[in-house]
Regions:
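Class I S-adenosyl-L-methionine
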Residues: 1-148
Length: 148
């Protein structure tokens, strides 16, 4: 069993590709890609359980009380915040559907291309996290580089 957080020996890479890295494994891979200054990141997330366990918002409770809807909202928020963190770190990020839903419901691709221009979205990220009561692993990993 391996863990990308333990992977060393590479200083810089051109492209990082992740496919269905479960839950926070995607976050560890994205943080590693940012640390390596990857020129391109292509990430197809899998399950997004972390924020499903955390998300709380009194105004959204009438919707969040339904498990299926909470799961879907949590998945979308997770991937949206991932894209925002990548933009903060100097990437142009897009979220795309890469295959028809009839083939798999896990059809979201986060595509990020390094621009070197750091985003000015830190406050927006923090407000979103605070409003939803979430603390994504990717944010922590990027804010504490070298501590993992």
């Amino acid at each position: 069993e391996g863990n990308i957080a333990d992977y060393t020996g590479v200083d810089e890479v051109d492209m990082v590709v992740t496919l269905h890295a479960c839950d926070t494994a995607t976050d560890f891979a994205l943080a590693k890609a940012v640390h390596w200054n990857a020129k391109v990141i292509l990430s197809v997330p899998c399950c997004q359980h972390e924020l499903n366990r955390q998300i709380k918002n009194e105004d959204l409770e009438p919707v969040l009380k339904y498990g299926l809807l909470k799961e879907r909202i949590s998945a979308l928020v997770t991937d949206g915040l991932r894209a925002q963190y990548l933009e903060r770190e100097g990437y142009e990020a897009q979220i795309l559907e890469f295959i028809d839903m009839e083939h798999t419901p896990k059809n979201i691709l986060i595509r990020a291309v390094r621009t070197g221009r750091k985003g000015e979205n830190e406050d927006a990220i923090r407000r979103c996290e605070q409003a939803l009561g979430v603390a994504p692993t990717l944010g922590w990993l990027l804010d504490h580089e070298g501590e993992v």
